[in-house]
Each structure stands twice: as C-alpha cells, then as structure tokens.
C-alpha cells in the first residue's frame, strides 16, 4: 500500500468518535444499571478480600479498585471513568495532538475498567470489538515523544495499520461463515431477511419499508451479504489498489444499509472506521493528482498485470456467486431467482480446506508490509535517524507479529479442527492475554430468531391486581402504533437485554427478577431506563403494588393494510405468561432474588460531601433531564461543526502562509528544497529527515 498518513489520521479521528459514543452512552445508564440500588449493582463484582492492590488488579484489571482510595463508590468510579473517557474523546476529536498513543492507551484502559464490572449489560460483541480495535489503535497512533514532527509518517506505521485490516477480515469473514455453520434454515434457504427487519432488537422506521420488499429481492440480498462477508474479504490482502477500493465500498454499502434499517449503536460506525484500513492516501487525494499518476504507466507493465489480476478476481467472484447460488434471471416476473447449490458438508469441507490458506495469505501480506517498512527505514537520510527508525521497525514488527499470532486462536474457532492444529504455545499465549480482551472471536447474526413472530416481553403493573397497565419502554417495541425510533449511536442496554430475555425463560435472565424488584420499589434510576421523561411512566406518582410480564409475538403490519391496523406499525398476539405476578414481600420473588444472589447488602455508602463525589452529583443532576440520543447527537453535531470551521479557517490560513513562504524563498532555496523532498519521498521518511521533507509534509496536511 502507499502512504497512509491521511488515512491513519481519519482512522484515529474515527476511533475517537467511537469512544465518545461508547462512554457517553454508558454514562447515562450507570445509576439504573450499576448503582447501589440498580439492576445489577457494580459493587458485587469488586469484593475487597484483603488482597494487595496489584493482586486485585491481576484478578480483575480495572481502575475501579482505586475508587475507595479517592472516596468513591464503585458506581461513582464508573461515572468518573466514563466522564474522563468522554472528555478525552472530545479532546482527541478537536485537537490532533491528542490523537496520540498515550491518549488511546488511557481510553483503552478506561473502557476495559468498566467492561470488567459491566456483567451481562456489557457482554456484547461490539464491546469486545471496541476493546480489540482500541488496543490496536495504541499501536497505530503516533507517540509524539518519539517523533520530530506530529504529522510525519513513520516507516513502521504501515505494519501496525495492517492489523486493522486483519481485524476487519476476521470480523466480516467469521460473521459470514457462522451463518452457514449454525445450520440455520433461514440462512440456508436465503429467507433470513424476510424475518430480520421485524425481529432485530430495535428496528428503525426504514426497516418497516425494507420488510415490504419482494421475497426474491430479499433472497438476493442474502446472497449479496454472503458475497460481501465471505467472498470479498479475501480481496483485502491482494496487491491491487482497485480491488481494495472495491472491497471498501462493498463493506461500506453493507454497513450503511444496516445503519439505515437498524439501531446497532456504535457497532456499524466502528466497522466503517475499520474499513479505512483498505485505503491509502492516494484514494483520498484529488482526481487531478490521480490523473497525473495514471499517465506514468506505459506499455505492458506492472499496471497491466494488476488490471489482469483485477479482472480475474472480479470474474471468479461473479462466477462462483452465480454457480453456488444458482442465480437465474426470470424475464416473466422481472426477478432474479436464487437458491443455495451446495450442502452443509460441502461448506464445511471448503472451510476446513481454506482456513489455513487464509492465514497464509494474511501472513504473506504482513510479510510484505514488514519488508517494505524495512526498506523505508533504510532509505531515511542520516545515520542516527536511520538507526532510530530501524529500532522502531524491529519493535513494532515483533509486536505486530505477536498480535497476529495470538489472534489465530479466536479466528480458528470457525473450524475447530484447524484450531486444534495450532501450536500449543500459541494457545498458552492466548490464555495469558485473554482477560485483557486483546483479541476476540466474532460472528454476528449466527441464527435468525423470531421465525413465526418476534417474541417480546411486555411488563405490566397494577394497584389492585384487577386493572393492569402496560409499562412502555422508550425504544423497544411495545405500543403497536408507536413508530420505531432512530437512536444510533446510543445503545439502551436494558432494551437490548429485554430482547434477549424474550428468546428464553425468565430464569435464564436473572437480572430480570432484579429489574421487577426495583420497579416495585419505585427506584427512580431504574425507572429512567424505561422512561427518561418520568411523566410518561404510568406509575410515576407511586410504584405499582403488583407486577407481571406477558410474552407476545409481534409482526410488522403489511403494506396497504386497511381497517383498524391501517395506521399501526405493528400487530401482535398474546402467547403466554413470562413472569408471574409478584409484589414486595412475595415469597416467590424473595426466593428468586436469593437464588440469584441479588439480596446481598451493599457496603456502607460513602459521603457525598467530599469535592469529587459532589462534583459528580452536580454533573449527573445537570445532564439527567436530557435523553441519551439527544446528548450524543447534539455533541456529535457540535464537534463536526467545530472541525469544519477548523478546516475552513485553520486549513486555509495554513495553506496561505505556506504558499506565501514558498513564493518568498530565493530560487536557490527552492531548488534545494525540491531536491531534498524528492530524495526523502523515495525513502518515505517517518522519524527524521531534512527540513525540505518536513516542509512538504506540512503543506500536504
């Protein structure tokens, strides 16, 4: 790949934005989820047993162990961590000098700290993905103390940035593979999307319209999903810029369509940021510079071979798609018919055959990046800077190879026979770092749930056990006439767990018993998870005496439907009781709370009069009235506006001053600068070099 300075800058900016969304979204939910009287109090995860600080840190790597030393309870420590993470993220979004390796190290440590006590509400694949991507960002980001200029590209940066591409490959390839290895009949029958839009956790209004699309188009969309997730990721590592750009737009299209039709918090945005690893700076430059570059190729050269490789790759991709999904154009119905033309055994055999070749392909790509980094290090002028660049190249090459090696363990979970063939030392190394979430396995939408109707838990409260009132949530489906919300990048973690709870028995979701108990107690923090505007909560005046939960099946209404449901988004049917009628002091409720260990007494509350706890309380009281999506959307819009003004005025003034300086230089100086920049361009210096090289880099930025 070519120069990656601009792409890396965009990636670091994007990761800063993802951290902002993750920290601020979680911050708004801490009191209800993890408070002393929340659904799953966080203090339960940190038992002070008399061990030393470092022993505790090894058992559970989280900064929350320091909470008592600064006068904070566990949930207050979580609030402080999320606020610090939000502030650091905002700073990194606004100021490039904060997009530094040390800053991203702090962000990663902060998110790992809350993850360790997050329990079931933080056990999502995108939380693990953020931790892995966040750790890789530490390696990708510049360490300002080791660089003479903040915007200079180092020889080893292409090596560490390759790890982002490898992570993207593992994420997409595994997500496609597990759909078939799960033996889910809807994925094999190509009918998964006829259920997906109405059965996903929190659909958007666009999902209703997507659900109305004809079945043949839904099946063709599943085929396209397989191509994007299983076939195209192999192009990530081929030596063709055109194939990588094609891969980039394919992945972006899939993620954008998912964002439009579903509320998946920051997950798809994070995937889009990872997709930047498929580009280089040439893709971000103007067409004029691209045209000048294109004119250099003459005759049958490397460029011609690359074109042949591109045509071969596109041809094979199209051929295999048509063959294995039996694509046929139906001119009578103006449709494209499709069906799987291979068996489960065929797919397993293919997967087993190609798992290790995929590793070899990735290793060859990494090897090229390492060799190219060595060449760039050797091309730097000056003995000292050449030696310094070589030392960095060695260190980061070993770090990259180490991360790649460890990641092979979770990657080969897609085929356990391949996983068993890895060296025992690789498994041992993985087990040592597993607690830090450095590498993870992925596989989204393994099975399509909700076939035959979307299961949904409806909570009801009553004062007299005769008249029952439904308790509506802000985001999950409930009221059949309420339109689906648009809340990305916020993740209402209670609503998400309600979706999972509906897929099984309430005993499989112990937190639900605690949730019901808190509603009976009238806990305000838990109520705000249900309705941020307490006036919309039906039991705002006093808590209900009785609570129960019913299981319903929900379906989207059909297009053109008339009658009573014409203006409704949903239709539903009662299935059975999900949770029995309980009340405060009820023996059944007390038994379930004891069974799940939810009756333990919390430690004594710390004083709120100290400066730090009182400051945290002031911030909480100030932000409490505002819904989380409003906070996130407002802050993101403000940051984008500020960045735009910085680019408009700051960039313009820098360009003007640079141009003025270049015109004011004597002719001899210009010749010297031209010669020095040409020399340093051939070596792509990253850590040192002459003044002309640095000047040219600054003008480009």
Task: Give the location of each predicted region.
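Alpha-helical membrane-anchoring segments
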Residues: 1-701
């Amino acid at each position: 790949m070519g120069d990656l300075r601009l792409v890396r800058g965009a990636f670091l900016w994007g990761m800063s934005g993802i951290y902002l969304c993750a920290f601020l979204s979680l911050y708004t939910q801490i009191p209800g989820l993890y408070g002393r009287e929340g659904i799953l109090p966080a203090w339960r995860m940190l038992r002070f047993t008399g061990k030393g600080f470092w022993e505790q840190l090894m058992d559970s790597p989280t900064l929350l162990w320091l909470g008592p030393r600064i006068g904070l309870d566990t949930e207050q420590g979580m609030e402080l961590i999320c606020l610090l993470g939000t502030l650091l993220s905002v700073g990194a979004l606004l100021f490039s000098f904060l997009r530094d390796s040390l800053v991203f190290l702090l962000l990663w440590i902060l998110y790992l700290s809350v993850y360790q006590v997050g329990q079931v509400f933080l056990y999502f694949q995108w939380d693990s993905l953020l931790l892995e991507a966040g750790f890789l960002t530490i390696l990708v980001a510049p360490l300002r103390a080791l660089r003479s200029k903040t915007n200079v590209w180092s020889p080893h940066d292409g090596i560490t940035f390759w790890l982002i591409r490898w992570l993207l490959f593992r994420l997409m390839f595994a997500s496609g593979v597990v759909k078939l290895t799960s033996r889910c009949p809807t994925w094999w029958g190509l009918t998964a999307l006829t259920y997906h839009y109405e059965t996903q956790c929190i659909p958007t209004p666009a999902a209703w319209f997507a659900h109305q699309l004809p079945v043949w188009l839904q099946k063709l969309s599943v085929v396209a999903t397989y191509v994007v997730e299983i076939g195209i990721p192999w192009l990530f590592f081929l030596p063709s810029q055109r194939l990588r750009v094609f891969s980039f737009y394919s992945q972006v299209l899939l993620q954008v369509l998912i964002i439009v039709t579903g509320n998946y918090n920051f997950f798809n945005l994070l995937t889009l940021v990872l997709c930047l690893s498929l580009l280089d700076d040439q893709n971000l430059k103007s067409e004029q510079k691209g045209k000048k570059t294109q004119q250099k190729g003459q005759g049958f050269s490397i460029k011609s071979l690359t074109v042949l490789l591109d045509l071969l790759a596109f041809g094979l991709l199209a051929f295999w798609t048509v063959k294995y999904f039996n694509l046929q154009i139906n001119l009578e119905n103006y449709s494209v018919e499709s069906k799987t033309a291979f068996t489960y055994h065929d797919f397993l055999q293919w997967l087993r055959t190609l798992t290790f070749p995929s590793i070899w392909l990735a290793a060859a790509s990494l090897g090229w990046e390492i060799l190219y980094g060595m060449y760039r290090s050797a091309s730097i002028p000056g003995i000292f800077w050449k030696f310094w660049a070589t030392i960095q190249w060695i260190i980061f090459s070993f770090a990259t190879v180490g991360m790649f090696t460890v990641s092979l363990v979770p990657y080969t979970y897609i085929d356990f026979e391949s996983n068993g063939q890895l060296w025992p030392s690789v498994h041992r190394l993985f087990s040592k770092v597993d607690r830090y979430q450095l590498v993870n396995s992925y596989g989204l939408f393994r099975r399509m749930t909700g076939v035959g109707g979307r299961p949904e838990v409806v909570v009801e409260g009553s004062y007299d056990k005769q008249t029952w009132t439904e308790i509506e949530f802000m985001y999950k489906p409930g009221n059949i006439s309420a339109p689906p919300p648009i809340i990305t990048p916020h993740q209402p973690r209670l609503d998400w767990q309600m979706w999972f709870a509906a897929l099984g028995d309430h005993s499989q979701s112990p937190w639900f018993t605690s949730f019901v108990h808190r509603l009976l107690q009238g806990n305000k923090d838990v109520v705000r998870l249900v309705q941020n505007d307490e006036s919309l909560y039906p039991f705002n005046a006093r808590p209900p005496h009785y609570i129960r939960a019913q299981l319903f099946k929900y379906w989207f209404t059909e297009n053109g439907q008339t009658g009573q449901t014409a203006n409704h988004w949903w239709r539903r049917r009662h299935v059975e009781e999900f949770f029995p009628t309980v009340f405060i002091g009820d023996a059944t409720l007390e038994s379930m709370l004891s069974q799940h260990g939810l009756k333990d007494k919390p430690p004594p509350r710390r004083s709120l009069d100290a400066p730090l706890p009182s400051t945290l309380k002031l911030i909480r009281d100030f932000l409490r009235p505002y819904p989380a999506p409003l906070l996130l959307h407002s802050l993101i819009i403000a940051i984008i506006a500020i960045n735009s003004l910085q680019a408009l005025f700051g960039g313009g003034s820098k360009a003007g001053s640079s141009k003025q300086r270049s015109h004011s230089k004597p002719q001899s100086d210009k010749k010297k600068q031209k010669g020095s920049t040409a020399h340093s361009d051939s070596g792509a210096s990253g850590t040192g070099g002459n003044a002309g090289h640095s000047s040219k880099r600054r003008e480009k930025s």
